[in-house]
């Protein structure tokens, strides 16, 4: 694909600065770095590097499952204001922080949901309601599919940033893909400029409804992946 245009890699300076200082100075701080430049590279640019590959038309609904401190949902919302974003997390203190953060950044069309992913996936207000699901959760693709794909409409997609073992994970997730109604449509290498960060962006299209029994309870999902 053509190289991403510069606007994908830079926020408005004041917004980026405010977001960086809020995250580094809060209880939700990014613990692997307090250097603002490194934070921007490893987290903000890392998150929005997927945008050129998502083929967004404007106004899509997106859910960030296990959003934590707001990654990748908040940077994606800043970079693409037309997105209607839902941030889901199991810890209320994270959502309290995100409520303050999104208000201070004057972000509209952002909904915060306090829920575990497996419970949210069974909630009719959330189940199969989204055009796009994103997650930075560190989980095997088979596990991530069961957590995330129930939120996605048929015809929508899951965007998963994976490491160098992405192809192996896809091979191991064939059963999960068939069960929850997904199809891998692309595996795209992504390198973050001026860093040694490299990812494999795995795009999964939702081609069939997810059977109602999925997602299962968390213990079963992790202990006995599909």
Question: Where are the regions that the model predicts?
Answer:
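S-adenosylmethionine
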Residues: 90-226
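Conserved class I S-adenosyl-L-methionine
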Residues: 58-66
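Conserved SAM-binding motif I beta-strand of class I
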Residues: 84-89
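Conserved SAM-binding loop of SAM-dependent methyltransferases across substrates and taxa
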Residues: 69-81
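Class I SAM-dependent transferase core
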Residues: 26-58, 100-110
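Short, small-residue-biased leader/transition segments that mark boundaries at the very start
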Residues: 4, 13-19, 23-29
């Amino acid at each position: 694909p053509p190289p991403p245009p510069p606007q994908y890699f830079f926020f408005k300076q004041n917004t980026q600065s405010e977001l960086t200082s809020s995250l580094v100075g809060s209880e939700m701080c990014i613990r692997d770095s307090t250097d603002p430049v490194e934070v921007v590279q490893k987290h903000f640019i890392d998150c929005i590097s997927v945008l050129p590959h998502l083929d967004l038309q404007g106004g899509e609904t997106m859910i960030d499952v296990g959003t934590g401190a707001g990654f990748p949902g908040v940077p994606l919302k800043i970079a693409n204001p037309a997105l209607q974003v839902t941030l889901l997390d199991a810890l209320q203190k994270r959502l309290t922080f995100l409520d303050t953060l999104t208000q201070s950044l004057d972000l509209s069309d952002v909904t915060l949901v306090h829920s575990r992913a497996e419970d949210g996936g069974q909630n009719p207000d959330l189940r199969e309601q989204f055009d796009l699901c994103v997650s930075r959760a560190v989980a095997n693709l088979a596990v991530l599919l069961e957590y995330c794909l129930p939120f996605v409409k048929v015809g929508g997609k899951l965007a998963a940033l994976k490491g160098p073992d992405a192809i192996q994970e896809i091979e191991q997730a064939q059963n999960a893909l068939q069960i929850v109604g997904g199809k891998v449509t692309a595996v795209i290498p992504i390198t973050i400029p001026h860093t040694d960060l490299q990812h494999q962006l795995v795009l999964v299209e939702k081609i069939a409804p997810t059977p109602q029994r999925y997602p299962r309870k968390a213990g079963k999902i992790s202990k006995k992946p599909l």
